Each structure stands twice: as C-alpha cells, then as structure tokens.
Amino acid sequence: IARKNAKNDCLFRFRCAYQPGTLEAVAYNAAGQETGRCAMTTAGPATELRAEPEEAVLRPGQLCYIRLRYTDQNGVLKPTVREPIRVQVTGGRLLALGNACPFNLQGYRTSHTDPYWGEAMAIVEAGTEGCVTLQADSTVGSAVAAVQVHKE
C-alpha cells in the first residue's frame, strides 16, 4: 500500500479499501534491511471448532493446555464467532476452562465457556497410562483432542 517512517508513537495508519485476501506488513531498519514481517488473512465462509493440545505425549499427572479455536477450513482464526463451548474429559481431569476476557463472570471451574476473540483454553490433568481425551461441542460443531499418557 505504502511506506511510512516510524515516529515516536510507533503507530502506522494507512487508508485502503477493504477486499478479501492477505494484508502483510513488513518492517525495515534504518539501513533498509527487513527486520520483521506479519500477515493477516481473511477467513473463509465455513466455520469449524478446533481443539489443539500443546503436548503430544504426557506423563501421569502432567498438565496439558488445549487451545479451542473457531477457524475456517484452512485454520484461519474467526475472532467474531462467540458460540459457547462445552467440554467433557475422559482419562484425566478438567482443571480449568475459560478465555482471556478480563471480565469473565463464569469463572474457570465449569465445563462450558464463551470464547473471547474466537478462542478459549482448557487445562487438563492427565490420568494414569492410556489416553486423555477432550471432547468439545458447540452449535458450530465438535472437536476432539486426544493425548497419549505414558509412564517414563
């Protein structure tokens, strides 16, 4: 779209007409060398619920953080989707479920939450050997995260 030099507030504003696609910002240092790059892509029309564990394998009693996200079919986050999410855990114990909203009246000790900007997080404690499974359901769809539990 254009280039601008940094000012004291490090805020850059550009006026442009909206069109779907990818918008990319590129940062350069004083010598003109690229120092950073960030892109945003328009989400597609379809919406799905995803459950993404941070770990692939756990030890008994270990905590697993499972990210719940509303995305399009390509995994692009859909931050305006606010459908409530309900979870059920087997092979472990749900310790907390919630979002990053600074004003959360529901608390974090329930099996349901509203997403904040399209996302929520579940914290699960692994049980004994086997598999810990989180089933997430909403009006949009369902998602499952399964993580193996092994004694070392």
Regions found by a protein language model. Give the residues of each.
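Beta-strand-rich structural segments
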Residues: V26-A27, G61-P79, I85, L134-A136
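Short aromatic-acidic-glycine turn motif
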Residues: A46-R50, Q88-N104
